[in-house]
C-alpha cells in the first residue's frame, strides 16, 4: 500500500512574541495571545524563503530515507508564497537534491492545503506505477499586514513527505476531500498582503470544511475518534484546531502533539506537514493518525494513516521539538527588517 516513506521538516530559528507585536500597535499583548492561543511565531531570516525551506525539509527527508535524487520521479510543492510568479519552486528543489532531469515537477496552489493536494497527486502517480517515489512539499512564508490580526499569527516553515510503496513508515489507508467556493481569504496578483473575511473565516469556512471532511474520512475508513492515537488539523490559530478536534469527538491527548501554532504561529501550507512530522517523530508501530488540512477558498483534505514497523528503523533525530527549542527571540524592528516591512524610500 502507498504511504509515507520518509518525512522532513524545517522551522526558521527566529521568533517574535505576540506581546512584542502588540506593543508596537498599542494593543494588549496578553489579550491577543489568549484570544488567539498564539504566544510567539516563527520568522524567516532575510535569506530564507519557500525555496530554501523546501530544500532543507526535503534534504532531511532524503537523509532519513537514505535516498538520493535518482530515486525521485516527481516533486510537487504546495505554497501560497512561492518566490516567483513565473518560475517553479519545484525545479529548484529538484536540482538541489540531484533529482533532475528525469522527473515531473510542478507548483501547487490552494491556499493552506496546497501541500496536501500534492500528497494526493503523488499517491495517484505512485499508485499507477508512473513513478516509484514522489515528494510532496508544503511550505509557506506567510504574510500579514502591519497591525492586522494576521500579523500576530502568520509565520513560516513547512515539511516534505516522500510518497512511495516500499519501506513505508505510515500507510495512507484513505483520503478524501470536501470543496466549495467560499471566499473567506484571498490575495490578488500583485497585492503584498492578503485580505480576509474576519469572523466569516470561522464557522462557514474553516469549521464547516474541516468538520465535514473529518466525518467523511472516518466514514470512509469505518472508524471512530477513539480508534485514533493522534489527530492533527490545519491551525490558523491556536483555538480553531482544538475546537474542531473536540467537536469531532477527540480528546486533548490525541491533538496536543500536533498542535504547534501556539508556539510557532500559522505556517499555512506547512501547518499539516509540521504537525504530522511532530507526530511521526514520536509515533510507534500500529499508531493510527487522522490528518485534516484546510485551505481557504475553500477545501479540506482528509487522511487516515497507520504507522508501520518500518518507522522503528528510521533515524528520527532533528525533530520538530528540537527545531522549536533552538528558536531565538527577536524584536519588532528586526522582524520588520527581515520581512521587508520597512519603506526605505528612494534608494537613489
Describe these PLM feature segments.
Residues 73-81, 107, 231-232:
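Short glycine-rich or small-residue beta-strand-to-loop segments that form or flank ligand, phosphate
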Residues 127-159:
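Flexible, glycine-rich active-site loops centered on histidine and acidic residues
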Residues 10, 78-83, 110-115, 138-143, ...:
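Acidic, glycine-rich active-site loops and adjacent beta-strand->loop/helix elements
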Residues 1-2, 69-73, 100-103, 128-134, ...:
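Short coil/turn connectors at secondary-structure junctions
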Residues 57-73, 211-227, 248, 282-283:
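Phosphate/pyrophosphate-binding loops at sites that engage ATP/ADP/AMP, CoA/4′-phosphopantetheine
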